[in-house]
């Protein structure tokens, strides 16, 4: 949401420049150099947010309705859906309010708009942080279920999962308020970037280790049944492809946004960096796309959840 003044807010006003006519083309930056700028139409931005909102509401509803899904794993998946819901909802609200203000359909005092902007920024930042945390929590949960299968139910209990969820939400809100309050400090932006890289490394290490264990297990079964080596290789290739897609989507959807934050610290006035800054709305749209993809990867693959979802949809009609 636009804020008066030359300073940029961490989330709300990094995109404070009014949206130009939607296009994909070359725009001139302040030095006259040509750079690629991708403008996201407001309608597309709102549509992506709405799809994500509906998807994640369905996931939360299905998990809440079915007591069989009240397990630690689904607790993390439900909270991931709630985080993605808030990411999409807060960005939709910000876009809608901005459009109404620009069109003159909504009259509000500057102080009220500023307070609303602060609230939306905190919600957006905290939901982004919690979303990354819950992606990491799901990876840790799956890792424990594979490498400590016999002790899993004693290690990952529902009370512990609830305490972890509460800690993640509280930490996300507190740190987001801190980040918003000190948005103009380079250390704040670097902390966010380091946090993203830490989550990326954590997920990569855990999932690669899980893939290696799965390949060893498949190789053992193949030897037991005296199968040919290509069958094991096929399993390994399939697992590697799945892992590449999972981590690739995570990096492609979240990476540009954190690259944006990194460049704000490293080269805020450089012409090339200025070109990248013009695509902030595209980076936010990619995060919303990730919120659309998350339910497909982590939730809708569950047969029990899909069955509950069908019941919810049939009852709603």
UniProtKB/Swiss-Prot annotation:
InterPro entries: GPCR_Rhodpsn, GPCR_Rhodpsn_7TM, Melcrt_ACTH_rcpt, MSH_rcpt
Localization annotation: Cell membrane
Keywords from the UniProt entry: Cell membrane, G-protein coupled receptor, Glycoprotein, Lipoprotein, Membrane, Palmitate, Receptor, Transducer, Transmembrane, Transmembrane helix
Residues on Extracellular side: 1-37, 94-118, 184-191, 267-279
GO molecular function list: melanocyte-stimulating hormone receptor activity
Family: Belongs to the G-protein coupled receptor 1 family.
Complex formation: Interacts with MGRN1, but does not undergo MGRN1-mediated ubiquitination; this interaction competes with GNAS-binding and thus inhibits agonist-induced cAMP production. Interacts with OPN3; the interaction results in a decrease in MC1R-mediated cAMP signaling and ultimately a decrease in melanin production in melanocytes.
Name used for this protein in its record: Melanocyte-stimulating hormone receptor
Protein source organism: Miopithecus talapoin
């Amino acid at each position: 949401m636009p804020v008066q003044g030359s300073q940029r807010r961490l989330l709300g006003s990094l995109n404070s420049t009014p949206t130009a006519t939607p296009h994909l083309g070359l725009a001139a930056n302040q030095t006259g150099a040509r750079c690629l700028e991708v403008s996201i139409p407001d309608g597309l931005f709102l549509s992506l947010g709405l799809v994500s909102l509906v998807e994640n509401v369905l996931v939360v509803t299905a998990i809440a309705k079915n007591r069989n899904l009240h397990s630690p794993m689904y607790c993390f998946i439900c909270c991931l859906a709630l985080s993605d819901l808030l990411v999409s909802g807060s960005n939709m609200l910000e876009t809608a309010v901005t459009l109404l203000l620009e069109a003159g359909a909504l009259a509000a005092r500057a102080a009220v708009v500023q307070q609303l902007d602060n609230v939306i920024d905190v919600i957006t930042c905290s939901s982004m942080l919690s979303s990354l945390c819950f992606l990491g929590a799901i990876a840790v949960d799956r890792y424990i279920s594979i490498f400590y299968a016999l002790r899993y139910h004693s290690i990952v209990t529902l009370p512990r999962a609830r305490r972890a969820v509460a800690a993640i939400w509280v930490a996300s809100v507190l740190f987001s308020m801190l980040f918003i309050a000190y948005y103009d400090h380079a250390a704040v932006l670097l902390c966010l970037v380091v946090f993203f890289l830490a989550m990326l490394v954590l997920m990569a290490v855990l999932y690669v280790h899980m893939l290696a264990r799965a390949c060893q297990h498949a190789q053992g079964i193949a030897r037991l049944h005296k199968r040919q080596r290509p069958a094991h290789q096929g399993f390994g290739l399939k697992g590697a492809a799945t892992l590449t897609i999972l981590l690739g989507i995570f990096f492609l959807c979240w990476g540009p946004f954190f690259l944006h934050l990194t460049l704000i610290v490293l080269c805020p006035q450089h012409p090339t960096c200025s070109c990248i800054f013009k695509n902030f709305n595209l980076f936010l749209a990619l995060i919303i796309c990730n919120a659309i993809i998350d339910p497909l990867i982590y939730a809708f693959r569950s047969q029990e959840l899909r069955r509950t979802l069908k019941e919810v949809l049939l009852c709603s009609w």
